[in-house]
Swiss-Prot record:
This is Large ribosomal subunit protein bL28. It comes from the Bacteria. GO terms for cellular component: cytosolic large ribosomal subunit. GO terms for biological process: translation. The gene is rpmB. Keywords: Ribonucleoprotein, Ribosomal protein.
Amino acid sequence: MSRVCELTGVSVQSGHNVSHSQRKTKRKFLPNLQNVSLFSDSLKKAFKFKVVARAMRTLDKVGGLDCYLLSASDKTLSKSAIEVKKIIKNNESKS
């Protein structure tokens, strides 16, 4: 089970814990992943994604799942998100 956001591509980062005496020990910075069902306005259907909390704020700012997916590049999206994006594009072209 990977720790990667399906919409933004944010993943685990590595770094150091630094003590007062400046000793450095390795650590991991884990993303704040949440399992969320996001509603598509054009498809009238909900989709489940594993998303970072910051991405949920971005979705609210942009105007929802449909607007975000259509404006996002395919490099950052997961395979399931790309499939949803294609379905939304096809649905908009039909109507």
